Amino acid sequence: MTREELYLGSFLHDIGKFYQRADGALNDKNELSEQSKKLAEIICPEHNGFPSHQHVVWTNEFFEKNQQIFLRFISKDQLSNIVHAAVYHHRPDNPEAAIVQLADWWASGMDRSSMGIFEDPQLEKSELRFREIPLNNILCALRVKQSDNSFQTASRQSVFRLRPLSLHAHDIMPSDYSNETKLSTELYRKHWKEFIADLEKLEKRSFDYRGLSITLYYLLKKYTWCIPSFTQDNHPCISLFEHSKVTAAIAQCLFDFYQDKPESFRTNTTPKGYQMELDENVFPLLIAGFDLSGIQDYLYNISSANAAKSLRGRSFYLQMTLEALAWQI
């Protein structure tokens, strides 16, 4: 498996969460093929005699239904490696799937935070809470220390609606939390159909492997920026897109480190699959920061005519420059 294949596998490892919330239950009426249903016994961990982490079944179904789109840009062997890394990350059977699992664990450590004072007993009791709970505004988690050493928290909760990312304020600005802002299978199904419609447009495109990776990155950003990654918290504030992006970044670092220093990893085969751990005092991750000097002069050295438009254009250019640097590195 190549580094590029591992990247796409890790980036798309949780696409099944999106698909599952738009579909029925595993043992109910759904869009799953018989092949995907049978695969559940192999790729899902077992909990109290039942398969858990069932979203991986829908991850497999996503690839199965859309394989012809992928095969326009990559070979069958490449697609097979990508699918394996994504689908087996909860019960890995090789080092690459175990790397995705480890990256998923590390990235998930950023998801498990509590919002504090806000509770919704109905969501606590709902078996469909993973379909109902919306992505929360992270600013509501702020606790401001007062002069008497007490902490002030947000007076109300705000959440994001399930809408494609756009420049319209009503799509991207949070709304006050209420029964009207809860999500549902119907809302997810509509959102999923819009995502698939955009994905199918790739059938008319022609680009290389890198072009496919970048296109899928921005396509998932458009549709999963507003989807909560982890729904066991009452008020999750990490999106599925951010979790997928961080998982892919960590997985690539672990893959590179494993290629250079395999002796730093401990492997173990258990009933839960092929598991991998790092030795203590081993640091495979490096965070890179970029500083574009002189940006204030660049930003504000503009004429007064159409100043707002020029300022937005230059700000966008700087943002895309940083993104291009990140992609290149």
Regions found by a protein language model. Name each.
Residues 1-168, 172, 230, 280, ...:
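Divalent metal-dependent catalytic cores for phosphoryl transfer on phosphate-bearing substrates
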Residues 282-285:
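A short, charged/proline- and glycine-enriched loop
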Residues 287-297:
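Catalytic-site or vestigial catalytic-site microsegments of nucleotide-handling domains
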Residues 296-310, 316-319, 323:
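Extended catalytic cores and adjacent scaffolds of nucleotide/polyanion-binding enzymes
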Residues 158-236:
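Extended, charge-enriched "interface" segments that sit outside catalytic cores
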Residues 51-59, 239-247, 311-322:
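Phosphate/oxyanion-binding active-site loops and adjacent basic polyanion-contact surfaces
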Residues 1-9, 18, 63-77, 238-275:
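Alpha-helical phosphate/pyrophosphate-handling elements in metalloenzyme active cores
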Residues 323-329:
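Conserved helix-loop-beta segment at the catalytic/binding core of cyclic-nucleotide signaling proteins
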